[in-house]
Design a protein with these regions (language model features):
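Membrane-proximal periplasmic segments of bacterial cell-envelope enzymes
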Residues: 1-577, 583, 596, 704-711, ...
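Beta-lactam-recognizing serine transpeptidase/beta-lactamase-like catalytic domain environment
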Residues: 81, 130-132, 136-150, 154-157, ...
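Short, hydrophobic-biased amphipathic alpha-helical segments
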Residues: 303, 307, 916-923
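Short, charged, low-complexity patches
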Residues: 419, 423, 427, 431, ...
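Short, hydrophobic alpha-helical segments
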Residues: 438, 801, 927-931
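Short, gly/Ser/Thr-rich active-site loops of penicillin-recognizing serine hydrolases
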Residues: 821-829, 921-945
Length: 945
């Protein structure tokens, strides 16, 4: 026994035996652990792993298209190439690739004058030392941490700064021939992690190739990189907290936040600001998907062939950067239809709350938070029809969230197509003619060829007021003339701050006041507008302005050749709207807003800068004017008063009323006929048709007053009750029924007067709110508190033209399935039918005919060259005593067989010539094909056996 023990002790002294025992013990532990994992807990871990590696990815369905009445495309999908980063593919740059990328970036930065890229914690000149800050203990800790981060072992922690530089030069293979400063730039880049080198390279190349980076970072993409929270401080704070900002960091402005993000993502210091912003856009998009790396991240869409070739050529370097195809939304007619179509965009939180409960036939959700949905117009209204059903791909991913394989897939189902009642050619003719006529009107003002003249001071004041010379951009500018003018503002107002609540208003007032007093010149304002890219000029033109050429002359030149729009000047009249319907169906043929916007700028890659400019534009291009701009109807209302008088027997078609100039029966202030106000004359005796021809206010004052006639005199309530009945018969008491969002009408009535008065004076007395004869007679000529949209007026004129049938207006004709079969159709809806006496209708029609054809008609020469007869009426409505009155024009055509009704409304358009009738005339010519010339005039005969 003793011998065995001695032998065992001898073995224990043998190193090989000890090592063998250790191996046996370790092997036993491994076997036991495997037994536990696979046998005892195998089922549990199997279920856990299976649940964690199966992920479902949506396959986007093709969105339905939108067409006009003839099948012309208005909203379609196009296929484009995009650059994506696939997080499931590992990026591991080798030594040579890292050197190539860092060298390329270094050479580019130095060639571009950026010599301060340096993230090394080492002084820039010999003798080199570390630049860590704090107590000795803190500095020692920082130094050790940094040395560990660059790959030094503990035994190398005593290396000096000079020795560390030498170590880095060798490790990162710093190119020969670089200066000391260039070497530091190179090292700052080469030491960045692989994702930063990739993002920096891509950001630089995408910018070089003219691409727009798809960006979710809520900072403007150009200096001064303002936040995109539209003043919502709660959203700003919440976002900052999501980026781990805290304490004082929550009060950082946008530029400090940019610096914070640069450090957060580990980008080198000293990089060009724009490159940092672009790179952060890429890094931030990847950061948002850090827990879903199986989902690719799109960083550029609709790329050029040059970008595609670059990505393909560098596939070995960046295997995680891929080219894919994507479906983009395209609006071929852009600004012509933007207010009707709207646009699509990735859904917001409020959108998701609206759509999250939508499910398909199997109960599966139809929407996810990353889906795009309609944000306005038809795109929003018919979202559920246009949106298809997404397909699915079931994939297997590893525990890092990276894609491994495809398990199963389901094909998507395309959305339905929507066909509108609108005629795109008619719409474009209306828009282009309206813009052309407004251009002519503004040019007359600037050149003194019209009734009113606009001075250079008025022109530039208008451009400041409408933000085409932006005070906001001026106070944010970092250089140029804008900065010089801003310094003038600071000298005049030392306490001014760009962050004060009324900063823009104060700056705008300073510019206008300075212009009037001469402390700010037209040249400075013109150069500001050029710097803000609100006016495109050649170098020669810019130099001529700098050398003293007339800014106004250049504006006139740009306006004349179409490089500048009338809306850009801000001078009245520079806005307008047109609405056209079929008189016998309620179909809308055209709905024009001017100025408009290009919805292509807001789809696919949302242009925040463009959208902010739209929001600040004083001409309100985002407003859908035909449906949401209400004005007093003026004399276009008089046909209703005429029919009310005729149908109630108050007058007959032959009844004459003598115009006395002043109408005194309704009390003071006395109402005046327009001709009396202008010339002191009168229209003399006129019947209803001739009263419409010359638009005699006195005739309709008298008629409105007579509608209240009783045995004891006049009853104003009786008169307005009668007028309200006929206003309702023409739809002026309700919405038009059109599918898009619209404002309701304001019909002059006792209830609406009381409401209006108490809105401004809650303590108004009964005598102040009661309805009077003065209210009635002013209602009879379309004034008082009457207020309607062009769509509502067109519905009224359409009803008049067809003899009394009130149709619900509609813009959608039918909806079609993806396979071409009919899904649904919008049928005509008759809301009311009023049986007017034929002789009464003819009397009113005759009056409207005389407007364009009578010897005294207000438009007797406007339609001379049109081969068809037109029934029309004009109207004006005053809103601001310092500006021209609004002008209305309504008509239906042809006179002997009415097919279409047209309304043109031009705010502040009185005295600008006849733009509205010219627009209507162009519409009639297009609709009736009067300018159509066959492209093939050769008669062809086809013989069939």
């Amino acid at each position: 026994m003793r011998r065995y023990l001695e032998h065992f002790l001898d073995l224990c002294k043998n190193r090989i035996f000890v090592m063998l025992c250790g191996v046996i013990v370790l092997f036993a532990i491994i076997v036991l652990r495997l037994f536990s994992l696979q046998i005892i807990h195998g089922e549990y871990y199997d279920e856990s792993i299976t649940a964690s590696v199966s992920k479902t990815l949506p396959v986007a369905a093709s969105r339905g298209n939108i067409y006009d009445r003839y099948g012309r495309p208005l909203a379609v999908n196009t296929v484009a190439y995009c650059v994506q980063v696939d997080g499931s593919v590992t990026l591991e740059l080798n030594r040579e690739e890292r050197k190539t990328l860092a060298t390329d970036l270094t050479d580019w930065l130095w060639a571009d004058g950026h010599h301060k890229v340096d993230s090394l914690p080492i002084t820039t000149s010999s003798p080199y030392s570390f630049t860590f800050k704090g107590t000795d203990e803190e500095k020692e800790k920082q130094e050790k941490s940094w040395k560990a981060s660059i790959g030094l072992e503990k035994k190398q922690y005593k290396l000096s700064a000079t020795e560390c530089l030498k170590y880095l030069y060798e490790k990162y293979d710093v190119p020969e021939g670089y200066t000391a400063a260039q070497k530091r730039t190179y090292l700052s880049l080469a030491m960045s992690d692989d994702r930063n080198l990739m993002a920096l390279t891509l950001a630089r190349k995408l910018s070089e190739f003219g691409e727009t980076i798809d960006d979710e970072l809520p900072l403007d993409t150009e200096a001064p990189y303002a936040f995109q929270f539209n003043g919502n401080t709660n959203r700003e704070k919440s976002w900052k907290q999501s980026m781990l900002m805290k304490g004082k960091e929550l009060n950082y402005n946008s530029r400090k936040t940019l610096d914070y993000l640069r450090d957060f993502f580990g980008l080198p210091e000293g990089l060009p600001e724009q490159l940092v912003r672009d790179t952060l856009g890429i890094r931030y998009s990847l950061y948002l998907k850090r827990y879903q790396q199986y989902q690719t991240v799109t960083i550029a869409t609709d790329i050029s062939d040059k970008t595609l070739a670059y990505v393909e050529e560098n596939q070995d370097t960046f295997p995680n950067v891929v080219i894919d195809t994507v479906s983009l939304r395209d609006y071929p007619e852009g600004e012509y239809f933007s207010h009707i179509l709207g646009y699509i965009r990735q859904m917001t939180e409020s959108d998701y709350a609206l759509y999250k409960d939508e499910v398909d036939a199997d109960g599966n959700p139809l929407y996810s938070q990353t889906d795009v949905v309609g944000q306005d117009g038809m795109e929003k209204l018919y979202e559920k029809e246009l949106n298809g059903v997404d397909g699915k791909v079931l994939i297997e991913v590893d525990n890092q969230g990276r894609r491994m394989s495809v398990i199963d897939s389901t094909e998507p189902v395309a959305g339905k197509d929507v066909f509108l009642t609108l005629d795109s050619k008619l719409q474009k003719v209306a828009y282009d003619t309206l813009e052309s006529e407004l251009r002519t009107a503004v040019l007359r003002k600037l050149t003194g060829g019209g009734k009113t003249y606009a001075s250079s001071t008025e022109l530039f004041t208008s451009m400041i007021n409408t933000n085409h010379i932006s005070a906001q951009k001026m106070i944010q500018a970092e250089d140029g003339v804008q900065k010089q003018v801003y310094q003038k503002l600071k000298q005049a107002n030392p306490t001014f701050s760009p962050t004060q609540d009324d900063a823009v208003a104060v700056a705008k007032e300073f510019l206008i006041d300075g212009l009037e007093k001469g402390s700010i010149s037209l040249k400075e304002l013109m150069l500001m507008m050029i710097e803000q890219e609100n006016l495109s000029v050649t170098e020669e033109e810019k130099t001529s302005i700098e050398n003293g050429a007339s800014p106004t002359a250049l504006i006139i030149k740009k306006l004349s050749n179409g490089e500048m729009s009338p809306a850009d000047t801000g001078l009245d009249p520079c806005t307008g709207s047109v609405f056209v319907t079929q008189v016998g169906t309620g179909e809308v043929l055209a709905s024009v807003t001017y100025p408009s916007y290009d919805n292509n700028e807001l789809v696919n890659t949302f242009n925040n800068a463009y959208y902010n400019d739209l929001l600040q534009d004083g001409n309100t291009p985002l407003v859908n004017r035909p449906l949401k701009q209400k004005k007093a109807s003026g004399s276009t209302f008089k046909m209703i008063t005429a029919l009310a008088g005729l149908e109630t027997g108050t007058i007959t078609p032959s009844t004459t009323i003598v115009d006395k100039g002043l109408f005194k029966d309704a009390g003071v202030p006395y109402a005046r006929c327009w001709i009396y106000s202008n010339t002191g004359g009168t229209h003399g005796p006129v019947n209803v048709s001739h009263a419409l021809e010359v638009s005699c206010n006195y005739f309709f004052y008298e008629l409105g007053y007579r509608l209240g006639s009783t045995a004891n005199g006049s009853d104003s309530n009786k008169a307005i009750t009668t007028l309200n009945e006929y206003m309702a018969a023409f739809g002026l008491n309700d919405y038009t029924g059109v599918e898009l969002d619209e404002y309701g009408p304001t019909m002059a009535s006792p209830a609406n007067k009381e409401k209006a008065v108490k809105t401004f004076n809650p303590d108004a007395t009964t005598s102040q709110t009661r309805w009077t004869d003065g209210d009635t007679i002013r209602t009879a000529i379309g004034q008082s508190i009457n207020s309607y949209t062009p769509a509502q007026i067109t519905k009224y004129v359409s009803t008049l033209a067809n003899g009394g049938t009130l149709y619900k207006l509609h813009m959608v004709d039918h909806i079609q399935n993806a396979d071409g079969t009919l899904h649904s159709e919008v049928e005509e809806t008759v809301e009311n039918v009023t049986k007017f006496k034929e002789e009464n209708l003819q009397a009113v029609y005759q009056g409207m005919y005389l407007v364009t054809n009578g010897s005294r008609g207000t438009l007797r020469t406007a339609f001379n060259d049109l081969p068809v007869k037109v029934a029309a009426k004009t109207g004006t409505a005053e809103e601001d005593k310092n500006r021209s009155s609004h002008t209305w024009f309504v008509c239906f055509a042809p006179f002997d067989d009415p097919q279409i009704a047209i309304t043109v409304m031009i705010p502040f358009g009185e005295g600008s010539g006849t733009p509205a009738p010219a627009v209507a005339k162009a519409i009639i010519r297009e609709y009736l094909g009067l300018d159509y010339t066959p492209t093939n005039t050769t008669m062809q005969t086809v013989l069939a056996e």
